[in-house]
Amino acid sequence: MGQKINPLGFRLGTTQGHHSLWFSQPKNYSEGLQEDQKIRDCIKNYVQKNMRTSSGVEGIARIEIKKRIDLIQVIIFMGFPKLLIESRPRGIEELQTTLQKEFNCVNRKLNIAVTRIAKPYGNPNILAEFIAGQLKNRVSFRKAMKKAIELTEQADTKGIQIQIAGRIDGKEIARVEWIREGRVPLQTIRAKIDYCSYTVRTIYGVLGIKIWIFLDQE
């Protein structure tokens, strides 16, 4: 059986960049890592609570964290930043104060910026949220997959593969279903591939969604 490595880690340094940029002493490294995870979770929870969207898509593509001695710079890449800004005009300031309270940044300044990504449905995280929303609303998984592929075609991608695993459509026996459109060269290191795995809780149990999107060849 072919073993699948995580496509993002496999391409680190060639087509993929790091989402956290900072240095620390080896003894403080684990603290910094946990802090990053907490910041990401805190932002996702805040967005979930304060954004009421019809499609159920929060639209966070990724969160980049850059740290200096006196500053934590957080950049949120979103597909639909309007939703956050319109639903809460002072949303970003609120989020900033919430994070500062959480991490009691006394000697460090916290700065949050929101950046819009050009083609939201060319991003696997946003697409996975879309599919998860469809599955929660009991739409058939094949319909959800086909709709997702239609959305990526508008975003000029070279290829996409979607895999859903678990008790699909509430069947007693769990199975894995997948669909591929276009090319997805996972073995080519210079191929720019974006990937995400997403867990969705339905009334029948947990489903796992994996999405590979082939964007471009370097």
UniProtKB/Swiss-Prot annotation:
Localization per record: Plastid, Chloroplast
Keywords recorded for this protein, A-Z: Chloroplast, Plastid, Ribonucleoprotein, Ribosomal protein, RNA-binding, rRNA-binding
Annotated GO MF terms: rRNA binding; structural constituent of ribosome
Domain KH type-2 per the UniProt entry, residue ranges: 47-118
An example Gene Ontology biological process: translation
Cellular component aspect of the GO annotation: chloroplast; cytosolic small ribosomal subunit
InterPro entries the UniProt entry points to: KH_dom-like_a/b (IPR015946), KH_dom_type_2 (IPR004044), KH_sf_prok-type (IPR009019), Ribosomal_S3_C_sf (IPR036419), Ribosomal_uS3_bac-typ (IPR005704), Ribosomal_uS3_C (IPR001351), Ribosomal_uS3_CS (IPR018280)
NCBIfam families, per the entry: rpsC_bact
Assembly description: Part of the 30S ribosomal subunit.
Assigned protein family: Belongs to the universal ribosomal protein uS3 family.
Protein name according to UniProt: Small ribosomal subunit protein uS3c
Species for this entry: Nicotiana tomentosiformis (Tobacco)
Top-level taxonomy: Eukaryota, Viridiplantae, Streptophyta, Embryophyta, Tracheophyta
